Every structure is written in C-alpha cells, then in structure tokens.
C-alpha cells in the first residue's frame, strides 16, 4: 500500500508501516508486563552466571568486592577498577594483560561517581579492552562501567571469555565461535519483539548509530514491505479475542492508524516548510526527480543527526545532574564525617572517664580482696592453731578420736531413701521413724566425712596422727561398722587399685617413707610390717607364702616388743614393697559372699607397722608401732542369710565385737578390771586401748533406710568410744644415758647374784641345815636360780642390753632367734626376788651407814659408789652370747597391765602389792656371802615367768608405790606358776 505524495514529492512512509507500528504497540501493551519480567530474569541469570564464574576464577578473597548475585549497580562497582577483569583474562590467556595495578583502597568504600585512580582507569580497564579486542572477544565501552552504563555488554563480554575458557579446557577442538545472547526457548514463536520501540513520533528514525545508516534502513524497509509481518501481527492481535470483540477491536485499530498517519504527514510537512527558501525550490525540483527511496534515506539521515544532537543534550543534562548529585553526596559525606568526628571525640572522652572509674573501682576491689585474703589467711591460721591445740589436748587427755564416714549409695540404689539428715564438719543427723512421725537424732564426733569425701581428704585429716609414729608414739587406727559399710574401702581401697583410690594403709606407709627420706640427715629409720588376721578366734599370718596356717599366740608383754612375735616381720623400704605385701595379705585373707555384700570380710585384719629411728647425733633410739585394723562388719543373720561356715564366722565376728564393746564400756566407766582377755581382738588391741597409744576409730555407716537400726547402734557405740580417756601416750625413747644406766643395772644384778650364790653355798657347807634357821632369825634374802628361760618369758626387763642385735628377726623362721635366746638364757643365773622385812629402825640405820635414801615404802636406794665398785667385775661372760631385737622396749607399764589382766587370784595380787622390801646392811651382806646355799631352787619353765626378776632403782630414780618400783611375788604365786608349768 502506497501513500499519497505531497506537493514537494512522495511521503517517506507507507500505510503498511503505520499499521505495523500500531499493531506492535498494541501487542506490546498487552504483553508488556510479562516481557519485562522475562527480560529482567534473563539479564539477572546471565549476570549471576558471569559473577559466579569471575569469583571462581579469582577466588572468594580476590572477589570480595563482587557479590555472588549482584545487581547491575553491584556488578558495575565490582568491576570498574578493572583488577578482577585483568586477573581473569590473565588466567584464561596468560600474559594477555602485561601489568595489573592493584587497588590502593577498598572499592566498596569509594563513593559512587567519585573519580577512580588514574592507574586503575587508564591502565587496568584500557589494557583489558585492548587485550579482548585483539583476541576477538565482544567488547564494551569504558563508560559502561560508570553509573548509567550498559551492563549487558559487560556481561556479554565476560560470558564470551568464559566460553573461550571452557573451549580451551575441553581441548580446543575445532574453531571457537561465541554464540552471543541466545534467547531461552520460552521466548519462542509467540514472542514478537521489535528492534526499536520508540514512540510514534520517532518511528521514522529506527537506526542504531550514525556509522551504520544504510543497512538498518534497508532492513527496516524490507521489514515494512514484507506482507507476512503485517499479517502475522494481525493474527497475533486477533488470536486471543472473542468473535464478538473483533469488530470493536478493528474499529479501534483503524482509528489509531488514521490518527498516526495524519500525525506523520503533519510532521513531514512542517519539516519541509522549515527548510531555507532558496534551497527549497531546487530541492523540490530535484525531489520530484529523485527516487522515493533516496529521499527517504536523506530524511532518515537528517532525523538521525537531529536525534544525536538531542541525545548529546540529554547526556549533558545527565552529566550535570550526576555532578550535582555527586556534589550533594560529597557535601553530605563531609557533614557525616564531621558528625562522626564529634561522636568519636565524645566517645573517646566517655571511654577515658569510664577507664578512670574502672581503675578506681578495680583498685578499691583489690584493696577489699586483699583485706579479705588477709582475714582468710588469719582465719585459716587460727583454725590450724586451734586444730593443733585441740589435738594436743586430745593427746594429753588420751581420748580416742572418732571419725565418721558415710558410704555413698551403690550403683542401682535410689538416693531418695537416704537416712542422712543434716551433716556438718563434726555433726551428723540421722532421720529415724518414730511413733509420731520422723525424728532427727544428732551425733557429734571429731570429724564427719560425707558420701562425696575422697580418700585423699580422709587421709589428710589423720596424717599428723600417723606421722607421730616416727616420733616414737604407738598409734592405732581401726575401722568399725556393719558389713558392707565401706571399712575395707577406707583402709585398703577397692579391688582395682589406683593412685587416687588407695586406702589408709598404702597412704600411711607412703607418707612414712616420705618423711623418713626427708629426715635422713638426722635420723635413720628402719620400717617393718606384719599382717595378721583373727579368723574364728584364731590368729593367722597373712604374709606366709607356703600356705601354712600355723596358729599364733598374742603376747602383750613379749620381750621383743611384738604383740604377735611368731608372725612374719618383713622389712620394707618403699611403697612398692608394701603393695606387694598387701596383695599377698589380701589374697590370704578370708572373704565371702553374703546377701549384704558380695565381698564380705570374714575376719579382722591388722596391718602392724614397726618403726625404729636412731638419732645420728645423740644416738637416741625411738620406737613406734602403728596398728591399722580393718574389723569385720557386724551383721544380722536374718539379713545376711548366712548358713554353715558363714554362720559360724558371723557368730565369732559378733562375739569379738561384743567383747570390744565390753572393753570400751569398762574403760568409759573407769572400772578397775577391763576384760581384755575375753577375745583375741581385744587382747590384740590391749596396748592401744590401755593408754599407751594414740587411738583413732573410723566408724562407717550406710545411708540406706533398711539399715537405720544398725546405723543408730553403730553411732551410739562410737559416742561411748569418744568418752573414753586413756591418758597421755608415752614416747618410746631410749637415750644414750638410759642405755648406759641399764647396762650398769644389768651388770650389778649379775654380780650381786653371783656373790650371793657363792655366799649361800659357803654357808651351807659350813653349817648344814643352818640356812633356814638364819633366814628365820634375820629375815634374809631368798634366792631362786632360774636355769631354763624360754623366748616367750617376760623375765627380760627393759634394762637388758640391746647392742649388737640384728635389726629384724629372720622372716622365714621367726622362732629361730628366740631358740638361741633360750640357750643363752639357760646358762645364766638370775636372782628372782628379794624379800626383806619392813622395819623402820633398820632402814634408818641403813640410811645412816650407806648415806643413801629410802622411799616411802622403806625401800633403800644404794649410792652410786656401790654400783661403780661392782663395774670392775667380769660379767661380760653372762651376756656375751645374747642378742635382742630392736623392738624391745621398757615393759614396766605393760607388766602392770599384765598384773591387772592376769589370771592370778585377788588375794595373791593384794599380797604382791602390800609386801615391802629392805636392803640389808653391809655387815649382813658380808655375812651372807660366807653362807652356802642350802638348796638351789629352779623355777619351772612357763610362758609368764618374767615377774621373777629384781628391779633395783638408781639413786637418782624415784621409786613409787606399787609394782612399778619393784615386782614381788609370794609363795602362793610361785606355787601357782609351778602348777601351770606342769600342765
């Protein structure tokens, strides 16, 4: 369809082109929303793809300015420095960009539109554009990286480089060719997109640039003249309309076509009329001669030039607007910087003020904490002094220390049924069920340990008591409680022993070794151990290795200082030796399984530690002994469900514990008679409970509700034990002076015995039968010679010599040394007793003649000159073959205990205590030496004949009342001992 010509010539457009423009605008209006969204999605997808590839190529750190999903503005800001582009191109094509200038500052912090660094702009971007142009990649303008630039061309360039990189990595097969911007399949045949979508007023100028004018014009004319495009547009407009709407739509389209046609004609007429008059005529004349197509091209060229001018004006306005915005932003940033400076100054002043206040507060808190620390140290110091003073008071009183320990619940037991109420440092409360509900009973002891107490805490509290063994004291620690309450755990530890779970036995010996090592420059200590058990009232050695169960005897006053002298005495020098011995002892100990405990101790075990220390400076000897007793638990047969041998064991255990309770009750009431010999257990603990040792009882209880009866009974017994006062413990200390005096006493006794024996024999030879007459007339000395003495006898007083004795008896045969002692004692002669009538006038005469003193009982004390004169006597023959154990000590006090607990009748004891002695005068002694012995008397061999020796005190020694000064026995006692010896 052709248009009519004007007066100057033909029109530059046709009706078909007008119709096509109207139809395209109509179709675009209907699909404008979907098309914009699809284009935006396509552009974003390509932009994200390019950004992700760039980030992978340069790394996350290098591409920190480029987000993974950037907007057009974010992509422009990330790439405008050119650093990322140059680095990527160098990775794809090494050496493509010879020099890359790094950014001096973070690109994100540079204000939008601010001039970039000259190095970045001219070096990086220019070098990149030159390189890609040489390589044949799609290029873009440097202004595209500025605000308002075309980001799609930048994305297209990046994707081209990506495609080239993938082609190279695949092997470079074939010829590389970039496909450009391929539209997705979703935008297929149904999409009708125009190249140029300008308004109707600018529809005549559809060229893209001045440099390429003819080709687009020809393409446009071809498109306009193509009838298929017009019919396609008509079908697209009418395809989705109803039949009844078609007439209205056609009418509307025709009206728009007419209106558009008229507008274009008017515009062309105005353009022609505005041309200069002189050229108008010639142009009009030539216009009729020129072809229609040439005139159209000239008009389009003119329109393009005008459009370019218009675009340049628009760009200038945009540049001015951009500069104004940048200036506004710059001013705003200056104001913000000033505000930030003011805020920084205020914040800095506030921080300085807060720092000053903080320092003042910190100084105040430091002074306060220092005061609290000083007060706390003072409190702990006072507490430690109070504890030491309390322990000293307890030592002076001789009270038995009582510690209480609560066993934790076993695995699988519920802790909600606990009977333990309030628990403090020295007080424990037990919840008991009463008729009116629950009640709380409180008990007070020296120390209370809860279920969470560790073995280290338990041992640290009794450590000073254990260390006193090295100072010469005897110590006894025994664990008491019902079966399954944790006694063996406290004393020995669990079955699987570790360093943290070691019991008192291991820790005590380890601490003794440590302290002995610390004192090695001043003291030399020898330590040996015994381990025995009392099983069914029989004493057995737990350290035997041959499996023999030889029955042992307990001797409270043995000459060796050992309670069980026949038991193995093993020297130890380290904790490892102790662990090996304890393993042997635990292996030999009697244990069994009951309903209350799967590993119940069926015997009382006692670990005895013997310590002898010698002062390297003075030569004084200190002897200490420590009993660590693990008592078998008391049990009720109906709960333990024992039968047979277990029942017999339980009966013996309960009987021995009952005997221990009787002894404690007697000691608490200060009864004159204490039944130590009712049980082997009390006989073993006699030295400890009799006032010669520091004693500690560890009472153990279970927290279960079904054991509340046994718990109350155990705690009541412990309360009675706490009331017992045994008196101050005694130090077993033998100084060099004491040893010398003992040797003098022994020598004088031997000399006196020999001389009196010779005198008796001479008198008997001279006057047969006259000795008894002389004895009845003057009340002289009766001499009994003991030719046979056994190792178990108690006749060896503390005055006997201890030099040249081996440190320990042989372990393999502990009785061998004692048999040798028997032979040596069998050849010696001893004076048993001296009985003198108590006459006051003769004592005064003795005192006036000898210059000595008399005691309150009339016993004469000889001056030292008498003893010095007899030192010249050769008495070494009597003692040269005898050797003693290092654990022999002064047994005077133990003799008293034997007297108090022996089987002798009460009249005999009263007779012994009421007899008085008298020292004869010098004339009487000389006359007696001339008299022969009428009849030698040999005492029978027995175990307890140590009471037959004479105890003569020195002049400097005070002799008191009772058997401590001199031990005396009458005829009745001698008769009883002779009878016992026959049986």
UniProtKB/Swiss-Prot annotation:
Calponin-homology (CH) domain spans which residues?
44-166
Q: Name one GO cellular component term.
A: microtubule
**Domain Kinesin motor, first and last residues per copy:** 399-724
Q: Where does ATP bind?
A: 481-488
Region of interest (Disordered), residue spans: 203-227, 276-295, 802-824, 921-983
Keyword Nucleotide-binding among record annotations: yes
Q: Which UniProt keywords apply?
A: ATP-binding, Coiled coil, Microtubule, Motor protein, Nucleotide-binding
One GO biological process this protein is involved in is:
microtubule-based movement
In its keyword annotation, does this UniProt entry include Transcription? Answer: no
- Bias (Polar residues) occurs at 203-214, 278-287, 939-951
One Pfam family from the UniProt entry? Answer: CH
- One Gene Ontology term of the molecular function aspect: ATP binding
**Cross-referenced InterPro entries, in alphabetical order?**
CH_dom, CH_dom_sf, Kinesin-like_fam, Kinesin_motor_dom, Kinesin_motor_dom_sf, P-loop_NTPase
Recorded superkingdom: Eukaryota
Taking the record's annotation, the residue ranges forming a coiled coil are 731-758
Q: Which family does it belong to?
A: Belongs to the TRAFAC class myosin-kinesin ATPase superfamily. Kinesin family. KIN-14 subfamily.
Tell me what this protein is called.
Kinesin-like protein KIN-14I
Organism field: Arabidopsis thaliana (Mouse-ear cress)
Question: Gene name?
Answer: KIN14I
């Amino acid at each position: 369809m052709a248009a009519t010509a004007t007066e100057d010539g033909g029109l530059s457009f046709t009706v078909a082109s007008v119709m096509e423009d109207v139809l395209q605008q109509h179709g675009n209006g209907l699909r404008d929303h979907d098309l914009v969204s699809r284009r935006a999605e396509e552009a974003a997808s390509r932009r994200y793809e390019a950004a992700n590839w760039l980030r992978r190529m340069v790394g996350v750190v290098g591409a920190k300015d480029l987000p993974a999903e950037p907007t057009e503005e974010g992509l422009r800001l990330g790439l405008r420095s050119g650093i990322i582009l140059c680095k990527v191109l160098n990775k794809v094509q090494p050496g493509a960009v010879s020099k890359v200038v790094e950014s001096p500052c973070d690109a994100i912090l540079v204000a939008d539109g601010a001039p970039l660094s000259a190095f970045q702009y001219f070096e990086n971007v220019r070098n990149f554009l030159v390189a890609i142009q040489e390589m044949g990649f799609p290029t873009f303008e440097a202004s595209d990286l500025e605000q308002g630039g075309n980001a799609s061309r930048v994305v297209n360039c990046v994707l081209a480089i990506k495609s080239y990189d993938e082609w190279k990595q695949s092997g470079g097969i074939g010829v590389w060719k970039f496909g450009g911007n391929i539209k997705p399949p979703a935008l297929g045949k149904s999409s009708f997109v125009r190249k140029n979508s300008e308004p109707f007023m600018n529809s005549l100028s559809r060229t893209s640039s001045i440099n390429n004018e003819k080709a687009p014009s020809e393409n446009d004319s071809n498109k306009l003249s193509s009838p298929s495009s017009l019919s396609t547009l008509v079908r697209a407009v009418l395809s989705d309309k109803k039949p009844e709407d078609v007439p209205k739509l056609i009418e509307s389209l025709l009206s728009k076509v007419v209106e558009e046609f008229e507008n274009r004609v008017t515009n062309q007429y105005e353009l022609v009329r505005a041309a200069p008059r002189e050229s108008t005529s010639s142009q009009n004349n030539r216009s009729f001669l020129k072809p229609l197509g040439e005139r159209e091209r000239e008009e389009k060229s003119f329109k393009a030039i005008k459009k370019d001018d218009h675009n340049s004006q628009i760009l200038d306005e945009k540049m001015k607007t951009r500069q104004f915005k940048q200036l506004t932003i710059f001013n705003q940033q200056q104001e913000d910087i000033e505000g930030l400076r003011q805020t920084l100054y205020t914040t800095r002043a506030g921080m300085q003020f807060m720092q000053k206040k903080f320092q003042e507060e910190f100084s105040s808190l430091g002074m306060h904490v220092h005061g609290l620390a000083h007060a706390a140290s003072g409190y702990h110091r006072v507490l430690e002094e109070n504890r030491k003073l309390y322990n000293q008071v307890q030592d002076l009183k001789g009270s038995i220390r009582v510690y209480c320990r609560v066993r934790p619940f076993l695995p699988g037991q519920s802790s909600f049924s606990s009977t333990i109420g309030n628990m403090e440092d020295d007080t424990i409360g037990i919840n008991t069920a009463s008729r009116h509900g629950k009640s709380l009973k409180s008990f007070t002891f020296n120390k209370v340990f809860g279920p969470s107490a560790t073995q280290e805490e338990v041992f640290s509290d009794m450590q000073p008591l254990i260390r006193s063994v090295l100072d010469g004291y005897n110590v006894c620690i025994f664990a008491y409680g019902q079966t399954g309450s944790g006694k063996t755990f406290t004393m020995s530890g669990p079955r699987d022993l570790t360093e943290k779970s070691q019991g008192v036995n291991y820790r005590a010996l380890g601490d003794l070794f440590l302290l002995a090592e610390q004192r090695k420059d001043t003291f030399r200590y020898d330590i040996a151990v015994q381990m025995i058990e009392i099983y069914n009232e029989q004493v057995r050695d737990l350290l035997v290795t041959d499996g023999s169960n030889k029955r042992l005897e307990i001797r409270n006053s043995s000459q060796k200082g050992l309670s069980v002298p026949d038991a193995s005495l093993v020297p130890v020098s380290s904790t490892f030796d102790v662990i090996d011995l304890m393993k042997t002892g635990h292996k030999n100990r009697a244990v069994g399984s009951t309903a209350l405990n799967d590993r119940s101790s069926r015997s009382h075990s006692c670990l005895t530690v013997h310590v002898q220390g010698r002062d390297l400076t003075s030569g004084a000897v200190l002897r200490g002994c420590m009993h660590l007793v693990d008592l078998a638990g008391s049990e009720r047969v109906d709960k333990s469900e024992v039968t047979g041998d277990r029942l017999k064991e339980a009966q013996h255990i309960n009987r021995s514990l009952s005997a221990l309770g009787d002894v404690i009750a007697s000691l608490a009431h200060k009864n004159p008679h204490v039944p130590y010999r009712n049980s082997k257990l009390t006989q073993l603990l006699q030295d400890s409970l009799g006032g010669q040792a520091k004693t500690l009882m560890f009472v153990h209880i279970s927290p279960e509700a079904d054991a509340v009866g046994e718990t109350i009974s155990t705690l009541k017994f412990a309360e009675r034990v706490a009331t017992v006062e045994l008196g101050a413990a005694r130090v077993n200390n033998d100084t060099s002076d004491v040893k010398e005096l003992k040797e003098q006493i022994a020598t004088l006794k031997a000399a006196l015995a020999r001389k009196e024996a010779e005198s008796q024999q001479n008198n008997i030879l001279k006057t047969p039968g006259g000795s008894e007459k002389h004895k009845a007339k003057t009340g002289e000395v009766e001499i009994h010679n003991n030719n046979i003495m056994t190792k178990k006898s108690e006749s060896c007083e503390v005055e006997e010599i201890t030099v040249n004795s081996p440190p320990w008896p042989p372990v393999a045969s502990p009785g061998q040394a004692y048999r040798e002692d028997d032979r040596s004692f069998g050849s010696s002669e001893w004076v048993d007793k001296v009985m003198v009538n108590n006459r006051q006038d003769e004592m005064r005469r003795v005192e006036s003649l000898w210059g000595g003193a008399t005691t309150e009982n009339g016993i004469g004390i000889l001056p030292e000159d008498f003893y010095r004169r007899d030192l010249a006597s050769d008495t070494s023959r009597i003692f040269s073959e005898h050797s003693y154990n290092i654990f022999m000590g002064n047994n005077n006090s133990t003799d008293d205990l034997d007297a108090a607990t022996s089987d002798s009748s009460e009249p005999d004891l009263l007779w012994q205590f009421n007899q008085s002695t008298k020292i004869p005068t010098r004339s009487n002694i000389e006359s007696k030496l001339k008299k022969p012995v009428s009849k030698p008397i040999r005492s029978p061999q027995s175990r307890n004949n140590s009471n037959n020796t004479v105890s003569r005190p020195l002049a400097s020694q005070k002799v008191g009342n009772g058997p401590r000064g001199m031990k005396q026995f009458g005829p009745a006692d001698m008769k009883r001992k002779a009878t016992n010896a026959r049986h």
